[in-house]
Every structure is written in structure tokens, then in C-alpha cells.
Amino acid sequence: MALTAGIVGLPNVGKSTLFNAITQAGAESANYPFCTIDPNVGIVEVPDDRLQKLTELVNPKKTVPTAFEFTDIAGIVKGASKGEGLGNKFLSHIRQVDAICHVVRAFSDDNITHVSGKVDPIDDIETINLELILADMETVEKRITRVSKLAKQKDKDAVFEFEILSKLKEAFESEKPARSVEFTEEQQKLVKQLHLLTSKPILYVANVSEDEVADPSGNENVAKIREYAAGENAEVIVVCAKIESEIAELEGEEKQMFLEELGIQESGLDQLIKASYSLLGLATYFTAGEQEVRAWTFKKGMKAPECAGIIHSDFERGFIRAETVAYEDLLAGGGMAGAKEAGKVRLEGKEYVVQDGDVIHFRFNV
């Protein structure tokens, strides 16, 4: 599933440094034919300890983790919604992503100038958010012009849409994003069709200095970002982009030792990948055989045939059953034979909603 998070941020906040760390740590693109091969797209493996344990259990010839795409979105400055900087290009790029990772500067460094002359994370956040709101306002106003005539004539669909558009316009006038507006399930379907930038889920990435990454509790800027994000019900990940680019060059034990020296349990990049994955409502199921153990990304709530289709359209078209076992039960049984003996392997049909951590063998006939 080619879902993408777009990385945005003002100049000199550490966005490019973080994105370069992502591309350095990049996954082998040959394993992921769906991924865009583009210099502004970084493909990363989704860290998952379960895959390693399955590999040890099954001992396959090949192990393939699931991957996630980050897009580096350049060109945002004050006035981007009016085409300033790389404004129009920026807006078209951000429309294509599924979620937004907003990198915010939370470090002080006199050698790195800030675009507005001072480090003010809330001002930075609001500058970008306002550009997105202004772009969405333009979309909504154009739509209102089109719909209002029909709404006045009491056209049922037009009245329904006009009500939604008016609600959105009111939010934008108060400088609030579309995701902050409550809609019914039916209304939400229409909002989705508008492809609004501010309806995309968001997480904030606070970029701190090297000496604060292990314990950012004394950083006032991080506290401000957390407080702002809490008002949006958004998550905050604390990273040091400079350190991440160093970590990206290390592997295995060397990487672990470096993290321990810094007093960090998990790299900021791994936290960012997991948080982005979760933000989009994604989960992982596994296929495990002698040839290959592989992790597959699916959207929570998907049924077995749809998940089978992620592997190949024939699997969905000719779906018969999904032989399924929970990852924990497979491990506890010491393998498929033990899990079957314990009665933990199930044959699931077309209506089965796949769960995170399911290990599945699909039966199909085309």
C-alpha cells in the first residue's frame, strides 16, 4: 500500500537534514515496486520486532519488511498559498500525501539563522497552518459559488453540501483546520471529496539540539509545541535531526551502542515511522513460508479478501479462505504445527476483519 507522509517545515528548521537521514536509512527499493523512485521520496522500512522473531522461527530464504514513504515537500514560506516561493508546486505536492509531518525548530543556534530572525515554534506552526488554511479557503469558496444557486432553489444535494461548506468556511475564518470540525459520517464522505489540505492528519516533529534529545523536559520550545499539539489532539515526536543523520549511517550493534551512549532507547526516525504508520490507521499482517517471511501493510478495518489483494489481485479475485493464526499464538506454539495442535489456527472467510499481527496463508482459486 503506497501511503505517504509529507514532511513540511520552514527553511532552516532541520527538515532537509531529517529527510536526508530518512533517505540514508532507506529501504531497498527493488522490494517495493509500488514506491515512487523520486529524489524527494524516501522509502524506509517499518521497524517491527515481530518480523525478526518470525524469521528466527521459520528460517526462510528471504525476509522482507514492510515499507513506508516520506515525501520531502519544499517551498513553503509565508505567502505560499498565493504562489510565493515554490507555493503552487508546494500545494500540489502536499495534496498528494496522506499525512503531514511538520518539522518545527526547537533548538537555538546563532550559526543557523531563522527565517523570521528568532526561534518561535508556535509562530512557525501557525505560519504553515495558515498557508494551508488559506489554500483550503480558496477551494471552499469556489465550491460555494458553484453550489449556492442550486441551494437557493432547494436542491436537496446542494443544500446538504452548502451546509458543510459553510461550516468549513466558518472554521477557516477562525484560522482552524478542517480536521478540527466535527461532521457526521455522511458529511465526512463529502468533505473527503474536497481533498482539503487541513483535513489530513498531522504530527509535529520537534527538532532539538544534541544535548537535549535524551531528556527534552527542560526545553521550553518542546513544551510549547506539546501544548499546541494537545489542542489539536496531535502527537509530538522529539528528534535531533543532526544525530539522526549520524545514526542512519550505522547498523546493528554499532547503532545500538550509539543510542545507549546517548541515553536513547529508540532512534527518532524509528519513532517517526511508527507514529506516521499509526497516524494513518495502518497495521501489519505477515506471510511466513520457507521461501519468504514478509510483512504487509494494510488499513485497519480491511477484510481478508482486500488484504489478499495487497499481495496480488488474483488472490482477492479467487479468494476462498484465509488460514489465520495470531503472531503470539504462533510463537507460543513454536511454529505452525504447534499452533494447530493447540487449536489456534483458524479458517476465516470473506467477512473476516484482519487484525494487526495476524499470520495468514491465503487459499484462492482463479
UniProtKB/Swiss-Prot annotation:
ATP binds at N12, V13, G14, K15, S16, T17. Its cofactor is Mg(2+). Pfam families: MMR_HSR1, YchF-GTPase_C. It comes from the Bacteria. Residues 281-364 form the TGS domain. Residues 3-259 form the OBG-type G domain. GO terms for cellular component: cytoplasm. Belongs to the TRAFAC class OBG-HflX-like GTPase superfamily. OBG GTPase family. YchF/OLA1 subfamily. NCBIfam families: redox-regulated ATPase YchF. ATPase that binds to both the 70S ribosome and the 50S ribosomal subunit in a nucleotide-independent manner. This is Ribosome-binding ATPase YchF.
